[in-house]
Amino acid sequence: SPGHWFYKEWIRKAAERNMLYLHFTMDDNLSLDEKIKARYEGMYSGVFYDRYIRGLWTVAEGLIYTMFNKDYHVVPSVPRDYEEYLISCDYGTLNPTSAGLWGLCEGKWYRVREYYYNGRKERYQRTDEEHYAAIEELAGDLSIRKIIVDPSAASFIEVIRRHDRFMVEQASNRVLDGIRDVATQLNAGDIFFCDCCTDCIREFGLYRWDEKAAEDRPLKTDDHAMDDTRYFVRAAFQPSRFSF
């Protein structure tokens, strides 16, 4: 980000500090062959492409997931031969609680269905037990490998453990890494969203960067399904998929 202290204090002041500033792009890395460079170019778009491929200090602005395409990423809610299932959950009290059931089919992950409850809109705050009952309904009689939950939701995690049906895991809450990883999987065509997941699809069109913030961060609105999607991607895809 151009708001980073190193950019402001050193790169922008290179002349007055009597320093030589050289700009490099990925193409300047002679250790990368064309096949690897093509793969990396396909992994990123938007601000991440400008930063990681073009080597630019680019400000994060506008929609976060500009690569999300309803015509491509949204698919019919039809039966598929899913091989395994995960559930991701972003827990809220007054803010919405969002959970997604994900199924793996032929190497691709699908958000099969979702649970989205807005206590403020409904004017009723559900208890942890009521949210858990909704998760049970979301899972049905499926075998769920694990539930990935917002790490701040300690009381809800304890409720899941006490019922002893699901294995529960605290989600990674490294926001920028998670956003980058979701963008990578959208670009790669590895995650899709069944058209019944209307709240998640709606949030993709609203999730934006906070352009007034000094550092990169999303606006804390319309981000609940986006958060649970981020938790899912960080858990479902191995870290090596994202590392150089």
Label for each model-derived stretch:
Residues 1-43:
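ASCE P-loop NTPase helicase motor core
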Residues 19-23, 86, 168:
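Conserved beta-strand scaffold positions in the cores of enzyme catalytic domains, especially
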Residues 22-24, 53, 112, 171:
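Hydrophobic residues at beta-strand termini and immediately following loops
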Residues 24, 53, 99, 147, ...:
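A residue-level signal for conserved active-site and pocket-lining positions in enzyme catalytic cores
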Residues 29-89:
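ATPase catalytic-site recognition across NTP-hydrolyzing enzymes
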Residues 80-104:
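Gly/Thr-rich phosphate-binding beta-strand-loop-beta motif of the actin/hexokinase/Hsp70
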Residues 100, 105-218, 237-244:
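Mg2+-dependent endonuclease catalytic cores in nucleic-acid-processing enzymes, primarily RNase H-like
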Residues 222-244:
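Charge-patterned, long linear interaction tracts outside catalytic cores
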